[in-house]
Amino acid sequence: MSLKIRLTRGGAKKRPYYRIVVADARAPRDGRFIDKVGAYDPMKAKDDPARIVLDNEKIQSWLAKGAQPTDRVLRFLDAAGLAKRPARNNPQKAEPGEKSKERAAKRAEKAAAPAEDAAA
């Protein structure tokens, strides 16, 4: 049984409220869960301490038992200092694409050609 620490959605239409729960990975998003370990209210201000409420002891015990947090919950745990989120590094993402490299090369050739003509 693979355990996940994840969000379950509650609240009304257009007014989301999430519970942070420990659940079997195969269970539906809003279905059966094992333990409630916190809450997240995205409608509150970002600096409001009640926006994210975590039960630190329960979370640490479930992490020790092997529960895996989802990406969003891992962000919350990292901000609270309960878990470390690995830094993502993708150096290729910053590189320009092939077509833009070709365009830049053509521009450089065109700029170099008039300079050579003026020098000659």
From Swiss-Prot:
Q: Does the keyword Cytoplasm apply?
A: no
Q: Which UniProt keywords apply?
A: Ribonucleoprotein, Ribosomal protein
Kindly list the GO CC terms recorded for this protein: cytoplasm; small ribosomal subunit
Give residue spans, biased composition: Low complexity.
111-120
Citing just one GO molecular function, the answer is:
structural constituent of ribosome
Record PROSITE patterns: RIBOSOMAL_S16
InterPro entries in the record: Ribosomal_bS16 (IPR000307), Ribosomal_bS16_CS (IPR020592), Ribosomal_bS16_dom_sf (IPR023803)
**Residue spans of biased composition, Basic and acidic residues class:** 95-110
Region annotated Disordered, chain positions: 81-120
Matching entries from Pfam families are given as: Ribosomal_S16 (PF00886)
Q: Which domain of life is it from?
A: Bacteria
One of the protein's GO biological processes: translation
What family, per the record? Belongs to the bacterial ribosomal protein bS16 family.
HAMAP family cross-referenced by the UniProt entry: Ribosomal_bS16
Q: Which NCBIfam families match?
A: S16
What is the protein named? Small ribosomal subunit protein bS16
- In which organism is this protein found? Methylorubrum populi (strain ATCC BAA-705 / NCIMB 13946 / BJ001)
Q: Which gene encodes it?
A: rpsP
